[in-house]
């Protein structure tokens, strides 16, 4: 590393501790960031990558002089232009935040006040810090709206948060951070919750804005393909320690550590599709659906899923993927068309279906923790369907719960834990066990890995594939991740604005010629190669000019 004086941000031997409260044990002190050092020059981007709990966000917040809830910075230096901000005190830190150092969170929706216009919120911190007059701040905001590619930049600031898309809201939050002309911005997973087609626009906008304003940035993510497009250097973190640190090309093309190699190689292999030699377990014929206000959300959708196979339903937010799952499960009645399961028509509404039909079709949700009662133990959560469908109680139910915990590779030691005591991956495994408890034939998987880190998600996918092979399960797997589609699917359905635009075996669905939307979707998936983002944007510009 170079001397700190030549860098805007210099972090040395950073140590951060927190107090842990393990169940049934006295509180204990744990180290969550251990001896981390790095430098960041003006106009450069350092990517921080690792799984949940690696310390990425904790380090990012420390660069703002902030110890997250329950955490304390107990050692090291964080120097901004040679000044150790950890020694400034509360008053000095307040003057920095929102002025020289800014933060862009993962959830832009949670960062904006729904009752105020976007333009007023974008300039608020800049005006409060008296860095510009309100008029100059509005001019700066307009310039940033243009740089970030927001629609109708002259009037964009007059909108409220609910009147713009998720991608537009994320760019508005970036404008808020850039408005005060800060020296440093911390981007904390700004594209994780976005669809691939939206993500590429936001990534391009952030990259362009950083270059235009010569701002330094820490870019936090668990997606190595994404960070490769925007960073100059990458730091790989695990359990609060630095695993590897170097130029992006070296990390991507010649990683030195086993853990980094595992991140680079995650989900490289594609599954060979099965041949349709079985009858369709599920058939959707010309199904349309609408909400109570008459808004049509599905338009004449027809597809089928063969027994023991996986049908991936792919598309961006609002495409109708989850609505299709709601119709299949009976949570939303179709306005026309029919759904048959193992050759028999399914009653449109859930409450009218026989209990055995309910048992045979189960759901696994995207956010496992919101689908579980936080006051129930794993024993209760998995045991509920055992009682509901099979009447199991007492020792018989406990024995079956233990069997299911072994099937999901967690072990019986978790049986009396609560959801809050589980990691994200463990919660999703419990959700899988709960679905298996009903002895289903079809499981609808609604983005079950989208909120998980790549290595954890890979473990969940491998578990699902193993269970499918052992129990001849059929999966309808909803996702917007083409890499997952390639890894697990036998057949693919592409949806766009409530319509089915492509359906067939994976080899056919993911091979040209493509319709325009499928082509866009496939080209928007970040690839683990340098310059991929620039190539995609250049291709888009050429195609746009040709049209």
Labelled PLM ranges:
Residues 25-26, 85-102, 128, 249-255, ...:
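ABC ATPase NBD coupling module
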Residues 64, 68, 329:
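Helix-to-loop junction immediately C-terminal to a conserved catalytic motif
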Residues 159-164, 168, 418-422, 426:
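Conserved ABC ATPase signature
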Residues 84, 136-155, 395-413:
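Conserved ABC ATPase "signature" region
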Residues 72-84, 337-346, 502:
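Conserved ABC transporter NBD signature motif
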Residues 181, 439:
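Conserved catalytic motifs of ABC-family nucleotide-binding domains
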């Amino acid at each position: 590393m170079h001397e700190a004086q030549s860098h805007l941000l210099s972090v040395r031997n950073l140590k951060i501790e927190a107090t842990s409260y393990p169940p049934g044990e006295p509180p204990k002190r744990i180290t969550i960031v251990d001896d981390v050092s790095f430098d960041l020059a003006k106009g450069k981007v350092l990517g921080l990558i690792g799984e949940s709990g690696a310390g990425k966000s904790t380090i990012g917040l420390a660069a703002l002089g902030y110890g997250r809830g329950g955490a304390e910075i107990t050692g090291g230096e964080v120097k901004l232009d040679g000044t150790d901000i950890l020694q400034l005190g509360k008053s000095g830190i307040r003057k920095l935040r929102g002025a020289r150092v800014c933060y862009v969170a993962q959830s832009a929706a949670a960062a904006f006040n729904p009752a105020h216009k976007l333009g007023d919120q974008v300039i608020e911190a800049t005006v409060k810090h008296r860095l510009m007059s309100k008029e100059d701040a509005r001019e700066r905001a307009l310039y940033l709206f243009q740089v970030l590619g927001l629609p109708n930049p002259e009037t964009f600031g007059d909108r409220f948060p609910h009147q713009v898309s998720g991608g537009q809201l994320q760019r508005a939050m970036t404008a808020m951070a850039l408005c005060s002309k800060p020296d440093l911005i911390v981007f904390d997973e700004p594209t994780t919750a976005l669809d691939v087609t939206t993500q590429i626009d936001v990534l391009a906008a952030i990259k362009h804005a950083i270059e235009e304003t010569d701002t330094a940035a820490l870019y936090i993510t668990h997606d190595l393909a994404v960070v490769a497009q925007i960073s100059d250097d990458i730091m790989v973190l695990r359990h609060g320690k630095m695993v590897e640190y170097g130029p992006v090309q070296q990390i991507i093309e010649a990683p030195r550590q086993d853990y980094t190699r595992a991140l680079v190689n995650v989900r490289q292999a594609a599954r060979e599709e099965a041949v349709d030699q079985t009858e369709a377990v599920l058939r959707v014929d010309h199904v349309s659906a609408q909400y109570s206000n008459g808004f049509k959300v599905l338009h004449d959708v027809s597809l089928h899923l063969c027994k023991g196979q996986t049908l991936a339903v792919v598309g961006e937010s609002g495409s109708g993927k989850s609505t299709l799952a709601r119709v299949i499960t009976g949570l939303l009645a179709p306005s026309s068309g029919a759904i048959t399961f193992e050759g028999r028509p399914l009653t449109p509404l859930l409450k009218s279906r026989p209990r055995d039909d309910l048992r045979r079709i189960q759901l696994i949700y995207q956010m496992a923790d919101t689908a579980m009662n936080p006051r129930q133990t794993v024993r209760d959560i998995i045991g509920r369907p055992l009682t509901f469908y099979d009447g199991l109680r007492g020792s018989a139910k406990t024995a079956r719960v233990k069997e299911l915990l072994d099937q999901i590779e967690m072990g019986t030691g978790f049986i009396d834990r609560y959801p809050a005591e589980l990691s994200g991956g463990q919660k999703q495994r419990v959700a899988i066990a709960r679905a298996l408890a009903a002895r289903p034939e079809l499981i609808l998987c609604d983005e079950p890995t989208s909120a998980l880190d790549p290595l954890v998600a890979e473990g969940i996918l491998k578990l699902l594939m193993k269970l499918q092979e052992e129990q001849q399960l059929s999966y309808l797997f909803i996702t917007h991740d083409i890499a997952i589609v390639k890894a697990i699917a036998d057949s693919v359905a592409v949806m766009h604005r409530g319509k089915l635009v492509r359906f067939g075996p994976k080899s056919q669905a993911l091979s040209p010629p493509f319709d325009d939307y499928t082509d866009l979707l496939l080209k928007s998936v970040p690839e683990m190669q340098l310059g991929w983002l620039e190539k995609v944007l250049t291709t888009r510009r050429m195609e746009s000019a040709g049209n």
